[in-house]
Amino acid sequence: PIAKAAAQQALLLDNQLAEAHISFASILMLGEWDWENSGNEFRIGIELNPGYATGHHWYAEWLLFHGRATEGLQEISLAAELDPISTAILKDQGMAFYYTRQYDKAYENAIKTLELNPDFITGFRLKSLSLQATGKFEEAITANEQWGKLTGDPVKTELSLAHIMATAGKKEEALSMTRAIVADQKLGNNDYRSIGQIYAALGNIDEAFKWLELSYIRREEALCNMKLDPKMDPLRDDPRFDALVKKIGL
């Protein structure tokens, strides 16, 4: 509410300020899932200042949330051209490659990001995801451990490891890890979505949707990636998948 009020106040003072429109759009998108108005605000901001890299960066997220992969890639690539040394943009361009199954390009962006900043937390996350997607599980685990050391969040690190184990065929180990985390009752933001994805990888579709519904109730930001996220692939043929996408408003 404070950030939204600040953005609205900035627009009242100067409604030609591109940065204010972009900030307001991001709040509407991630904080309220107001897709129509956030999209309008992004487009206004970009029209006011086409050279504002952050505008193209965040609008790319909006497009990718909607499954508009080609347009999303174009926007994030434009952001990278405008600000080639932004680790956040490089990482999210890598995530766009990941969402569009261009895993080698995703890995390249992870390496570029970490070359610019060796301690950039989500650079290791992107590296782990891209390695996992290409079946390089041991390397993915190493990158996941590096990510976990920097985040200081053992729950997210363990959930990510459990998903790697599930996709590597170590299903009993993955299930045991997941049940232990749930029993510990220390779940945080986006963890319910992660558990749903683990159960999807394990082939337990009913349990997966149970956790994704809990993620929806908690309005977890990461759930908005479900239209393109490869980890959702085991669920796409189930009618509950499209029903959940519709509930989110995408």
Task: Go through the PLM ranges and name each one.
Residues E47:
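N-terminal/domain-start segments enriched in small and hydrophobic, helix-friendly residues
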Residues Q8-L17, G51:
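Flexible helix-coil transition and linker loops at the boundaries of alpha-helical arrays
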Residues P1-Q8, I22, W35-R43, Y52-H57, ...:
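Alpha-helical protein-protein interaction modules
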Residues A25:
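Periplasmic c-type cytochrome electron-transfer domains
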